Amino acid sequence: MTAIDPQSLEKHTPMMRQYLTLKAQHPDMLLFYRMGDFYELFYEDAKKASELLGISLTARGKSGGDPIPMAGLPYHAVEGYLAKLVQLRVSVAICEQVGDPATSKGPVERKVVRIVTPGTLTDEALLQERQDNLLAALYQGKTGYGYATLDVASGRFVVTELANTEALEAELQRTNPAELLYSEDFSQMSLIAGMNGTRRRPEWEFDYDTCQRMLLNQFGTKDLKGFGIEDARLSLQAAGCLMQYVKDTQRTALPHINSIVRFNQSDSIVLDAATRRNLELTVNLQGGRENTLASVLDNTVTPMGSRMLQRWIHQPLRDHDIIRARQASIAELMMTGDFETLSEDLKALGDVERITARIALRNARPRDFARLRQALTLLPQLQQTLSAASAPHLKYLSQVIGVFPEEVDLLSRAVVDNPPMLIRDGGVIREGYNEELDQWRKLSEGATDYLHELEAREKEQTGISTLKVGYNRVHGYYIEVSRRESDLVPLSYQRRQTLKNTERYIIPELKEHEEKVLSSQGRALALEKQLWEQLFDLILPKLHELQDFAQASAELDVLCNFAERAESLNYHCPELSSISGIHIEAGRHPVVEQVSQSPFIANPVTLNAQRKMLIVTGPNMGGKSTYMRQVALITLMAHIGCYVPAEQAVIGPVDRIFTRIGASDDLASGRSTFMVEMTETANILHNATPNSLVLMDEIGRGTSTYDGLSLAWSAAEYLAKQLQAMTLFATHYFELTQLPEQLSNVENVHLDAVEHGDSIVFMHAVQEGAASRSYGLQVAALAGVPNCVISAAKHKLHQLESRDHDVQQNTEQQGTQQNMSFVPSAPSPAVEALQKLNPDELTPRQALDYLYNLKKLAL
């Protein structure tokens, strides 16, 4: 059954009518329907859950004349299944029994009490500790896009306006939302086609007036001018829809969402989607998190510090004052060595940011309060270390972190040292906190002593050695006697239960005592839950200060981490200049140097007004791509305030970093490798400025030699002459090394290699001037191309070089000059085939077949 007609509900059983009514209210979610000790799913939900969770798909009789597909899972194991569904970006509505079965006529009353969606998680068991979990909303208008993100687990609410699809694509990649809301009129579906967790919302949810009222009500303000978003109409519409969705799913007040920040792309260095991917900032090209910039830089000691560091990496700043404040803090932490002491203290803070959010949502658990108490207790010690700080930013962070003596006192008096996971069974509130609770507990505990006395007395009076007093939830208190001594039981004993080897009885005195015990236990538990709820009310007035403390502690963690990384990895403080250019001495790739088995060869780079472009040549595997990437990464690191892997770095204003490195087919959009390459190139040529850093690697490979060379030459010329962007342009078209002869701001550099017999040694050192050759055949041999293919290729290369030499001599004798001086001659089809050959992708068999094809082409 794929859909339920409301008109046919009467055909179903009362229970299924209840289920179908609830399911109709949550059509795009799996409905976990509580049945005793299980959550059950029916119809399409059951089939989907069976497939996703690997649970059995069965049937539960018939309803409406059709078999009902059914799947179930134990209620006590639900968190594990929820975690798996959340990872798959599937939302779940959890339906519980809220009525009393004893008084219910028909099905027990049920209602959805919790909604779990990928973007609204707050439970630590469902969240990735060191990654933000964002809910996003997207609205398309005539002038661009409005985009809003909210981290429900922290309360961080950010909006931005984007002018075009390229900017939107970059922002989607930067934020990587767990769940994305978009309007039914959204037209650029190709941008989100591959994303999980997308939710199509009706257009009316993005109504401007409705969204504005929603935000004003949430923040308790008369207008939005104080947040700087009053003129950001599109992002305001996205934010309003997002806020309504959160209210619908959380079903509680959201006091921790108390502000909204507008992100302006002009405040940070713009990184497009290709650049974030190619530089492997937080995710590598295979989709993992190892061997990324974040994996090297992140030695933070708190989860909230780690999340902040990743946000910084994806959002390098352009404001030199903020960067210098961070640098000064790092310098002082290194000079005093305080980063080690502070890191030890910070480590014990845990994830205060998310704990505070759970308190605001009133779904914190007892251990959250215990962890908060531990964190707040450590603050005087942290402040003592910071008290001697002279760096202005460290002083500011110390002031924001503050101390919370009243909250420490409250939590110390109220919560036991090692509380249970849940409040459900009590045992959370400390003795002495509430006199009435202590009295009820003593009554309950005194009852235990009474039971021991009763057991001893009855044993003595009856002479039954096996007699003992027990308790279970079904039958309450009872007297248990072995079967062999049951004939000694007095007539006043009333049999309650017969087991295999024992008999169980009750007596009026024990029944009366049971009522007293259960009454005292019940009253104690009810009062404890009431006191527990009051704890939230007592902590929440300090919510904003606690949020600020968490934010400042996270930043202090990142700065201490930067100090540790600088000291451990031999990083140096970069100098920020107001003059355009990049000068790096002995720069190193921060990731490659950590994973390389051999010592990393440091290299310099200089880009300035007189030297805007470097044409980078050299052999494959010689290090061209590594060299270019390290320049970009050092530049990025400098703009997050981090020290850099270089002996010296002077970096001027940078507005964007572009990379056109490597490409693959975009099958989802129907674009070939060459089309992807040209699209990325077009984006660079349209948007680069004199303050942009551009990395271009092997432009023009995916087409004919003439086409590729012409495109590469023209793109390089446009970048250097018209745009004057700071550019590293790697190529195997040696004709491009003639470009410096025509443009004064272009120079050649190369990565050297040395031949030794038939082998080659890569020096990985950058030298001035152009490379003499590309060593393609030697690299092919290293890759394992069969010797017969290498020999044939050498012979063919000699023939081609001889022919080109003859053509050149004839041209010189005739005194003519080709219009395109950088094209020596028209190559044969065999040459073009060799140009397109990628030896790394050939098996021995394919290489042999290729050789035969080359022979045919040469004839």
Curated annotation (Swiss-Prot):
Gene Ontology annotations for the cellular component aspect, listed alphabetically: cytosol
The keyword Plastid is assigned to this record: no
Cystine pairings recorded for this chain: none
Compositionally biased residues, Low complexity: 808-819
A GO MF label: ATP-dependent DNA damage sensor activity
Function: This protein is involved in the repair of mismatches in DNA. It is possible that it carries out the mismatch recognition step. This protein has a weak ATPase activity.
Official protein name in the record: DNA mismatch repair protein MutS
Gene source species: Shewanella pealeana (strain ATCC 700345 / ANG-SQ1)
Origin organism lineage: Bacteria, Pseudomonadati, Pseudomonadota, Gammaproteobacteria, Alteromonadales
